[in-house]
């Protein structure tokens, strides 16, 4: 308990972190419930609940993005930043918003304030939602039961590992600078 309080005191926006983490917890509980559903009807019911939750979360995430830009790790912690990304990632009904979120995230790409894996995932999600091929190979097709079933189209399958390495180069540069 003491450690968590000390950690939260170091964050610039700890109350925002809590708000984001609550939304993400609901998001994940619903998706888990859908994956565990025993019938088509139950999956459809939970899918509707997910759609409603995603819509409400998107309104909140848009407001946060307008007020703060993309909150970094020093603002809301690694968990908060990962969960903020998750909520943007699940805003598939609004690819224009996802593009705006990606642009805000892009500004922090070389600062160490974001998880670059999340950047790659959101980049590919935006590409897919705009009917383009993904670059980093992060997006997969899903079965009705929530099982991964092969990659969605990749722009350069032979070079996808190079793309992934290039994405994390910013982290390597930051670490090398910090080590000096």
PLM features: what roles do these ranges have?
Residues 1-81, 90-92, 109-113, 122:
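Preference for long, solvent-exposed alpha-helical segments and helix-linker "stalks"
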Residues 1, 119-129, 154, 179-180:
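Alpha-helical solenoid repeat scaffolds
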Residues 76-83, 122-134, 143:
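Charge-rich, acidic-biased intrinsically disordered regions
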Residues 112, 118, 130-132, 140-151:
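Alpha-helical protein-protein interaction modules
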Residues 93-97:
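Short coil/turn connectors between adjacent alpha-helices in alpha-solenoid helical repeat scaffolds
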Residues 64-65, 98-106:
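Alpha-helical repeat scaffolds
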Residues 137, 141-180:
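A cross-kingdom marker for long, charged
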């Amino acid at each position: 308990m003491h450690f968590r309080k000390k950690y939260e005191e170091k964050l610039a926006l700890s109350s925002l972190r809590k708000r984001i983490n609550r939304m993400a917890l609901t998001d994940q509980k619903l998706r888990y419930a859908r994956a565990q559903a025993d019938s088509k009807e139950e999956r459809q019911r939970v899918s509707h609940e997910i759609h409603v939750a995603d819509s409400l979360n998107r309104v909140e995430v848009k407001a946060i993005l307008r007020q703060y830009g993309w909150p970094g790790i020093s603002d809301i912690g690694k968990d908060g930043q990962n969960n903020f990304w998750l909520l943007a990632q699940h805003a598939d009904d609004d690819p224009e918003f996802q593009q705006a979120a990606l642009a805000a995230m892009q500004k922090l790409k070389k600062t160490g304030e974001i998880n670059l894996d999340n950047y790659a995932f959101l980049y590919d999600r935006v590409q897919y939602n705009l009917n383009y091929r993904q670059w980093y190979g992060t997006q997969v097709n899903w079965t009705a039961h929530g099982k991964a079933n092969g990659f969605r189209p990749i722009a350069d399958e032979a070079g996808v590992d190079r793309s992934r390495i290039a994405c994390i180069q910013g982290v390597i540069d930051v670490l090398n600078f910090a080590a000096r």
